[in-house]
């Protein structure tokens, strides 16, 4: 386990709730924070099994729900900060993604996010980025799960979207 901080967006939380694997992020990173906006997104209209998994994971401390971080980027004429603030205001990002990215930027944390546009913004802001598939690979490498493929198959069967090429590339890279 690393002593790093991980900021989770809603997509991976939903995926891990469907798999009943919400403990994996904290087992790998130690500290996992979820913004209030992301928490509202994942608990607003979840499937019943997802809600039970999310509530149980929060109660045992798998993650901490924290206030949204409204960063004051760009107030001091820093052009790189201005550019990062502009990325956070991308209308293609939903409020949860914006709040997760703002907190990750403010804390220099890794951001756990699946949505393509959010990942692109994180990369542009030079944040460490991890997705659900990458988290599952790390969990396998750490001996926390035996195989990735059955979990990916279960996610896809549940209706969770993962790009076919990304899945194929990821599974091929680990020999599954």
Indicate where each model-derived feature is located.
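Active-site-proximal, substrate-binding regions of enzyme catalytic domains
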Residues: 2-109, 116, 125-127, 150, ...
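Acidic, PIN/NYN-like endoribonuclease modules and their adjacent C-terminal/linker elements
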Residues: 119-176
């Amino acid at each position: 386990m690393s002593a790093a901080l991980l900021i989770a967006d809603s997509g991976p939380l939903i995926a891990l709730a469907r798999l009943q694997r919400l403990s994996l992020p904290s087992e790998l990173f130690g500290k996992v924070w979820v913004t209030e906006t992301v928490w509202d997104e994942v608990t607003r209209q979840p499937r019943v099994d997802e809600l039970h998994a999310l509530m149980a994971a929060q109660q045992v401390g798998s993650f901490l729900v924290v206030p949204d971080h409204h960063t004051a980027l760009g107030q001091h004429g820093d052009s790189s900060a201005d550019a990062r603030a502009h990325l956070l205001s991308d209308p293609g990002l939903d409020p949860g993604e914006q709040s997760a990215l703002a907190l990750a930027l403010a804390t220099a944390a890794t951001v756990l996010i699946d949505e393509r546009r959010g990942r692109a913004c994180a990369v542009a802001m030079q944040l460490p980025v991890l997705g659900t598939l990458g988290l599952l690979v790390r969990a396998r490498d750490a001996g926390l799960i035996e195989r990735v493929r059955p979990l990916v198959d279960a996610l896809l069967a549940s209706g969770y979207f993962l790009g076919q090429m990304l899945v194929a590339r990821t599974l091929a890279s680990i020999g599954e």
